[in-house]
């Protein structure tokens, strides 16, 4: 049997709309992500389990893990009879790369089970294609970090889909999911079709400056440049309490605060444990809306998707 864990990810990381993504894992060892197991069988089957299993579609063929199996078999030109099991530990529509977790874990598990017939870039291309079926368009800012780990910059040139950007080992990423759902498609539809020239210039400056600060290891400068002029001004209205949380992050001493992907999860970057804990406590008391919500203090997950057991 093969079992793969795929971690949560932050799409956009504020400053890089559709071109930056970061994988994260809780510092307490909690597996914040999905697991998919594959074992030999006479015919294909798919079993679902996990905390958020009730959110999955009733029709097995609408399950993205089934579609991963189907697309993988098509790619290698062979039907592989297997029993698959999805542990859905990630809330759907959370802004934590939930669909990416299932896609990455599903495709990597099949590839490992079949002794890796597909190379990493081919597999990553399939991951983007499958995730795009859910989000409505192909973009790699969740699947790339989820699969490869770390902070990934999307390139899509010279045979590379993405490459890793050096980040800051001391940073703690406080992740808060309030327990409500925001559709990625809805969150994309709310964005304007065109942007002002000044916004385009600011976006380019922030993104270029952030990448430069990462490569030259200037954490304060990098955090200062984590500003979103593309999505956050429009998506804030979809996120009850986000404006208050952003103000609290500033008061508490977080280096940066932003929307994770399409939301409603937010992240706050801190450079010491005490500040991160104060931020986590505030978010637990003020940002969570029901018992499905949660807060985790995380670090960058540099390993990405990996075999378990």
Curated annotation (Swiss-Prot):
Coiled-coil ranges (or none): none
Ligand binding (ATP): 91-101
Record lineage: Bacteria, Pseudomonadati, Pseudomonadota, Gammaproteobacteria, Enterobacterales
Localization per Swiss-Prot or TrEMBL: Cytoplasm
A Gene Ontology biological process term: threonine biosynthetic process
Entry annotated with the keyword Amino-acid biosynthesis: yes
Family: Belongs to the GHMP kinase family. Homoserine kinase subfamily.
GO molecular function (one): homoserine kinase activity
Reaction catalysed by this enzyme: L-homoserine + ATP = O-phospho-L-homoserine + ADP + H(+)
Biological or metabolic pathway of the protein: Amino-acid biosynthesis; L-threonine biosynthesis; L-threonine from L-aspartate: step 4/5
GO cellular component, one term: cytoplasm
Broad class of where this protein is predominantly found: cytoplasm
Its biological purpose: Catalyzes the ATP-dependent phosphorylation of L-homoserine to L-homoserine phosphate.
Organism whose genome encodes this protein: Serratia proteamaculans (strain 568)
Keywords, comma-separated and alphabetical: Amino-acid biosynthesis, ATP-binding, Cytoplasm, Kinase, Nucleotide-binding, Threonine biosynthesis, Transferase
Pfam families (alphabetical): GHMP_kinases_C (PF08544), GHMP_kinases_N (PF00288)
The keyword Cytoplasm appears for this protein: yes
Gene3D superfamilies hit by this protein: 3.30.230.10, GHMP kinase, C-terminal domain
InterPro entries documented for this protein: GHMP_kinase_C_dom, GHMP_kinase_C_sf, GHMP_kinase_N_dom, GHMP_knse_ATP-bd_CS, Homoserine_kinase, Ribosomal_Su5_D2-typ_SF, Ribsml_uS5_D2-typ_fold_subgr
Gene expressing this chain: thrB
Protein name per UniProt: Homoserine kinase
PROSITE patterns named in the record: GHMP_KINASES_ATP
E.C. no: 2.7.1.39
């Amino acid at each position: 049997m093969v079992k793969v864990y795929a971690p949560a990810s932050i799409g956009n990381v504020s400053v890089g709309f559709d071109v930056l993504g970061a994988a994260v894992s809780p510092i307490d060892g909690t597996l914040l992500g999905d697991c998919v197991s594959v074992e030999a069988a006479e015919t294909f089957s798919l079993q679902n389990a996990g905390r958020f299993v009730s959110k999955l579609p009733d029709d097995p063929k609408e399950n993205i893990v089934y579609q991963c199996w189907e697309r993988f078999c098509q790619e290698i030109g062979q039907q592989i009879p297997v029993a698959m099991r999805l542990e859905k530990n990630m809330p759907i529509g959370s802004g934590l790369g939930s669909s990416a977790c299932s896609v990455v874990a599903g495709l990597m598990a099949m590839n490992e089970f079949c002794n890796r017939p597909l190379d990493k870039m081919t597999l990553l291309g399939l991951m983007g294609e499958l995730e795009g079926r859910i989000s409505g368009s192909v973009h790699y800012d969740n699947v790339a970090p989820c699969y490869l780990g770390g902070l990934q910059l999307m390139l899509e040139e010279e045979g590379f889909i993405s490459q890793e950007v050096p980040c800051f080992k001391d940073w703690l990423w406080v992740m808060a999911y309030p327990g409500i759902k925001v559709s990625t498609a809805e969150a994309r539809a709310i964005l304007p079709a065109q942007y002002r020239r000044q916004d385009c210039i600011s976006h380019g400056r922030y993104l270029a400056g952030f990448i430069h600060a990462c490569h030259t290891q200037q954490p304060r400068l990098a955090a200062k440049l984590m500003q979103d002029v593309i999505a956050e001004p429009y998506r804030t209205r979809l996120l009850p309490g986000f404006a208050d949380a952003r103000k609290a992050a500033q008061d508490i001493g977080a280096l940066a605060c932003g929307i994770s992907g399409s939301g409603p999860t937010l992240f706050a970057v801190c450079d010491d444990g005490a500040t991160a804990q104060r931020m986590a406590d505030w978010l637990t008391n003020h940002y969570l809306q029901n018992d499905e919500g949660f807060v985790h203090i995380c670090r960058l997950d540099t390993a990405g998707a990996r075999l378990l057991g």
